[in-house]
């Protein structure tokens, strides 16, 4: 999702921090060719890695144009990492 503009506020930053994720890490996952799945309620689930190799799930919504709003992010479970690696082959 190179070229996306990220929308956020203090509330988003605090929410990510509760999950141990820095906003820059969430953005890095989205910029690093993630595996993206769409949910029934128009949210997107991005499975990917940071530059440091950390595996994260980033939940986001697309806004107007190139704007993306990250809702939450967390570490992938071991099962999710395994599935991510399999689908990335």
Cite the ranges covered by each PLM segment.
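Ribonuclease/tRNase effector modules and their secretory precursors
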Residues: 1-89
């Amino acid at each position: 999702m190179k070229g996306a503009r990220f929308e956020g506020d203090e509330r988003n930053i605090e929410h990510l921090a509760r999950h141990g994720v820095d906003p820059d890490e969430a953005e890095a996952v989205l910029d690093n060719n993630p595996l993206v799945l769409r949910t029934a309620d128009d949210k997107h689930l991005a499975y990917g890695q940071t530059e440091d190799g950390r595996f994260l799930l980033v939940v986001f919504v697309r806004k107007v144009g190139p704007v993306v709003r990250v809702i939450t992010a967390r570490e992938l479970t071991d099962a999710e990492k395994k599935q991510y690696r399999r689908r990335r082959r």
